[in-house]
């Protein structure tokens, strides 16, 4: 076979990184893959729900040698703010898609302390590469509480928008990507 006819596999194997704060992944069969990178965060202080200065420094040191690209399992919702540290490493424009019941766009309760409730707002306020945020599944009540001024950057698909009557949603009925037919 000539070199011109050979296809080169251009897939890149991005790392799968598990950030273990609570031990929750100890009970998950999928996490036992020896190719996954485990970061043991159980010894860190100042990281649960809120991330203080020491916690921020420790976490940034911990992820410094890993690329932002990849899949990052970041424990419970108390640690979603870690997404900010990963996106801070991106050097090209990006859109952030968040699947959560909460928009995580509250002003910080304490002066400049990142929290599980403020990290999306912090990314929008400080990361010039973040061009758009799409939040899927947030409650209508919490969306109404989002501070004004983010309408051009944030798109919400609320839990109400996503609700549907049984039997009226679109389903893919064929597993083949070439022959996907939609049924109602």
Language model features: what each stretch is:
Residues 74-141:
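Active-site histidine-anchored catalytic micro-motif
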Residues 13-22, 72-75, 95-98:
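Short, hydrophobic/glycine-enriched beta-strand segments
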Residues 42-69, 76:
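Active-site-flanking structural segment that lines cofactor/substrate pockets
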Residues 19, 99, 178, 184:
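Active-site flanking residues adjacent to catalytic metal/cofactor-binding acidic residues
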Residues 172-179:
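Conserved small/polar residues in nucleotide/adenosyl-binding loops
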Residues 2-53:
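N-terminal glycine-rich anion-binding loop in soluble enzyme alpha/beta folds
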Residues 26-29, 141-146:
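Short, charged/polar "capping" segments at the starts of alpha-helices
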Residues 112-122, 141-142, 156-171:
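Active-site glycine-rich loop that binds ribose-phosphate moieties when present
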């Amino acid at each position: 076979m000539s070199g011109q006819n050979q296809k080169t596999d251009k897939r890149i194997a991005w790392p799968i990184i598990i950030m273990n704060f609570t031990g929750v992944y100890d009970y998950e069969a999928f996490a036992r893959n020896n190719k996954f990178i485990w970061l043991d965060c159980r010894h860190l202080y100042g990281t649960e729900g809120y991330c203080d200065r020491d916690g921020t420094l420790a976490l940034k040191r911990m992820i410094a040698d890993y690329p932002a690209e990849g899949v990052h399992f970041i424990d419970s919702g108390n640690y979603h703010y870690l997404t900010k540290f990963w996106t801070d490493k991106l050097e090209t424009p990006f859109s952030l898609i968040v699947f959560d019941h909460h928009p995580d766009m509250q002003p910080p309760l304490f002066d400049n302390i990142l929290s599980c409730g403020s990290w999306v707002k912090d990314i929008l306020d400080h990361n010039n590469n973040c061009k758009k945020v799409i939040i899927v599944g947030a409650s209508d009540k919490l969306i109404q509480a989002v501070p004004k001024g983010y309408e051009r950057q944030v798109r919400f698909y609320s839990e109400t928008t996503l609700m549907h009557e049984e039997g009226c949603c679109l389903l893919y009925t064929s597993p083949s990507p070439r022959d996907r037919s939609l049924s109602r």
